Amino acid sequence: MNKYDLIERMNTRFAELEVTLHQLHQQLDDLPLIAARVFSLPEIEKGTEHQPIEQITVNITEGEHAKRLGLQHFQRLFLHHQGQHVSSKAALRLPGVLCFSVTDKELIECQDIIKKTNQLKAELEHIITVESGLPSEQRFEFVHTHLHGLITLNTYRTITPLINPSSVRFGWANKHIIKNVTREDILLQLEKSLNAGRAVPPFTREQWRELISLEINDVQRLPEKTRLKIKRPVKVQPIARVWYQEQQKQVQHPCPMPLIAFCQRQSGAELPKLGELTDYDVKHIKHKYKPDAKPLRLLVPRLHLYVELEP
């Protein structure tokens, strides 16, 4: 597919996403609200995106006001939806849950629009991250040329429906993203960045080429069978633990935005028990089990690329 077809499809899918989000807003707004609880987190100011987070103060909102905040949050996709002092590199987060009473017909209608919304989100992410063929450092320019001010992470995030949950509790998750990669994978990624011929701030084009060339040399010097890992820290994330009494099952969901709980009237579903998200303090985190990690040596800091050392 040529570049212009790709851009046209991206713009078309985004316009469709805006329509479905508006339809979802209207559908949910018309349903009887039986409970709503959202947790506002501090905004991340420009220049502080990469600072380690040690404490987070949580503010709770309930009822109709929480519902309004939650429904608005699903449509907050652009930088102009937030203050000028807020970082454009950090996505907005509003964990919580909105609980609605529904008939079977209303549930099917809501599930259909949520499914369509999530399909459009997934397709947009695929267009931008895969079909564009661009390395990550060039996607920002590509997206903002055609959808100026779009916050891609907010756009990609899926909306999570819950059907007749018994309880919804909240907490925090601290983790790393760990991915095994091959030497060839990394060389291909680096050569793609080198051949793009662009500058990535704060580097000039020449400085960027020099940095990428050094990284390529470091990787090329490794033996072919070297075990490589990308171990990227993920900032602490709000999560929800949802319990279903009938199935005796617990499901854990990432919770960067409100979950939508549907309670079926015909089934006699009761209002789920709702927990609170407490303030986060890194000093008070307790690990139930922390396995011994294999020793690693950092090779390419920018990519969080490590060499796995033999014991």
UniProtKB/Swiss-Prot annotation:
Location in the cell: Cytoplasm
Main location, first listed in the record: cytoplasm
Top-level division of the source organism's lineage: Bacteria
GO biological process, one term: DNA replication termination
Pfam families xrefs: Ter
GO CC field: cytoplasm
GO function terms (MF aspect): DNA binding
Keywords: Cytoplasm, DNA replication, DNA-binding
Role description: Trans-acting protein required for termination of DNA replication. Binds to DNA replication terminator sequences (terA to terF) to prevent the passage of replication forks. The termination efficiency will be affected by the affinity of this protein for the terminator sequence.
Protein family membership: Belongs to the Tus family.
Protein's name in the database: DNA replication terminus site-binding protein
Gene encoding the protein: tus
